Amino acid sequence: MWASGSVKIPTHIAVIPDGNRRYAKKTGIDFYHAYKKGVEKVRNFLTWALEFRDIKNVTFFALSTENLQRSKIELEILFRIFEDELRRTLEDPLIHDNKVRVRFIGDRSLLPGKVVKYIDELESVTKNYSNYHLTIALGYGGRAEIVRCIKRVLSGEVRLETFSEEELFQCLDTRGIPNPEPDVVVRTGGEKRLSNFLLYQTAYSELIFLEKLWPEVEREDLVYIIEEYSRRQRRFGR
């Protein structure tokens, strides 16, 4: 597609897949089928990302702590879809053939037992994979993540006297994930904010906002993301 060395491909892409509910209203379909299409698009996006072998990490913001304040009916729809997708992913050739390690970040105590069961199983069956890394933020909030980290310090798990930026990374939900700082954060749906997503990890991430609603995203949009990222000069505050 590109001449060798002409494009700088990000190794870690984080995605805020916004716009499922607006897609339902726009197309006249119900929330269940809109969210179902949104979840299917996550798999599509991962498939496209794996075609670019330099993309090693993909992180999705699937459900925030704020999202948990939505109606009971909407949450039941979401959790039913999550259960179905997690169960299917346990035997997904896309994961196993490419040796994708799957991790989940967030507060699992906020999630239904069946969802947690499948999360644990999926993490277990992929724990020895290391070619690629897929991280799903579920029941996650960036501020809550930092609070959990502070509690670990106060409990004595980490020595306060030697506490450093690097040790803070080891307190966060993303500890153990190679390159936990996204090179680029992509948000669909036209909104231009992080919405409490990876607040510490995104200090120097490039931000790209797409007007398209998440279910409308296609492979050409990932190509645009890569090309736009390649045009940027990352200065890391210097």
Swiss-Prot record:
Residues of the active site: 18, 67
Keywords: Magnesium, Metal-binding, Transferase
Co-factor binding comment: Binds 2 magnesium ions per subunit.
EC number: 2.5.1.89
Superkingdom of this protein's organism: Archaea
Molecular function GO terms recorded: magnesium ion binding; prenyltransferase activity
Catalytic activity: geranylgeranyl diphosphate + 7 isopentenyl diphosphate = tri-trans,hepta-cis-undecaprenyl diphosphate + 7 diphosphate
Ligand binding (substrate): 19-22, 64-66, 70, 187, 193-195
Listed InterPro entries: UPP_synth-like, UPP_synth-like_CS, UPP_synth-like_sf
Cofactor field: Mg(2+)
Record-linked PROSITE patterns: UPP_SYNTHASE (PS01066)
GO biological process, one term: polyprenol biosynthetic process
CDD domains recorded: Cis_IPPS
Function: Catalyzes the sequential condensation of isopentenyl diphosphate (IPP) with geranylgeranyl diphosphate (GGPP) to yield (2Z,6Z,10Z,14Z,18Z,22Z,26Z,30E,34E,38E)-undecaprenyl diphosphate (tritrans,heptacis-UPP). It is probably the precursor of glycosyl carrier lipids.
Family: Belongs to the UPP synthase family.
UniProt subunit comment: Homodimer.
Protein name: Tritrans,polycis-undecaprenyl-diphosphate synthase (geranylgeranyl-diphosphate specific)
Organism name: Pyrobaculum aerophilum (strain ATCC 51768 / DSM 7523 / JCM 9630 / CIP 104966 / NBRC 100827 / IM2)
